[in-house]
Amino acid sequence: MSKSESPKEPEQLRKLFIGGLSFETTDESLRSHFEQWGTLTDCVVMRDPNTKRSRGFGFVTYATVEEVDAAMNARPHKVDGRVVEPKRAVSREDSQRPGAHLTVKKIFVGGIKEDTEEHHLRDYFEQYGKIEVIEIMTDRGSGKKRGFAFVTFDDHDSVDKIVIQKYHTVNGHNCEVRKALSKQEMASASSSQRGRSGSGNFGGGRGGGFGGNDNFGRGGNFSGRGGFGGSRGGGGYGGSGDGYNGFGNDGSNFGGGGSYNDFGNYNNQSSNFGPMKGGNFGGRSSGPYGGGGQYFAKPRNQGGYGGSSSSSSYGSGRRF
């Protein structure tokens, strides 16, 4: 594809992670299947750099987001006789967040203003899929809105599409959106991340493949209830009115402790809004999948998946 024909939409939004591949699946057979829904600008089955054995997952990149949507709407997919699981690819930066790879149907929406009603949330988020439930959280005692809400969809892909797009405006105001995790999911994801010491469930270390020794679909990484549980300290929402603490103890935007107080204000936390650090979407010159991070492949000329993250084109620093 020439530069003049390069897609205008960020590559990150046009890419699908394909898990659960047969070890017999090749780049060609993967391409043959997924090009039914659009033009593929890249397609790769990830392999061990030494043995060349498939790691059981790959990536396909479409020319447009519309084609990605078409492919996701055509689920389930079967490649070489095996049902595979396509998911919207998570950037290396976002993959550092606990629960980034969990499959959930509920989102947390923070920073919403007091005059925001259910219809404002519905009007905005229904473009991403069918909404089942909208909950605007209020203080049990005073009934005052607490500045955050939960939206539950009928399909996890709606959530995945929302969270990779970063910036959302509801009722004229920017808001923060995250996957809503149960207390158990948050604790499990946090402990799992600490235990891995950076090698990552989706690669990271040179020896790591997807799921660290082909754990795809077994460790609960792609399952899990929606819902929300609160911080490891037992905070949560409701109870004694201690605010939304679910993301507090991991150094996220939502602060340490009670990120949102009962008036729905940020507690001296800076926002993510503004220019993205480090050029999160990178460029084609850095290879089809940017740096050596989780859920992403290294440029092919650097051999394989995982390994060093020093060449990453997906920014730096954790925001969760």
From Swiss-Prot:
Annotated spans, Nuclear targeting sequence: 268-305
One annotated GO biological process: cellular response to glucose starvation
Organism: Mus musculus (Mouse)
Chain intervals for the UniProt region annotation (Globular A domain): 4-94
Primary site of residence: nucleus
Cross-link position per record: Glycyl lysine isopeptide (Lys-Gly) (interchain with G-Cter in SUMO): 113
Ranges where the record places region Globular B domain: 95-185
Protein name: Heterogeneous nuclear ribonucleoprotein A1
Sequence ranges of Gly residues compositional bias: 197-216, 276-294
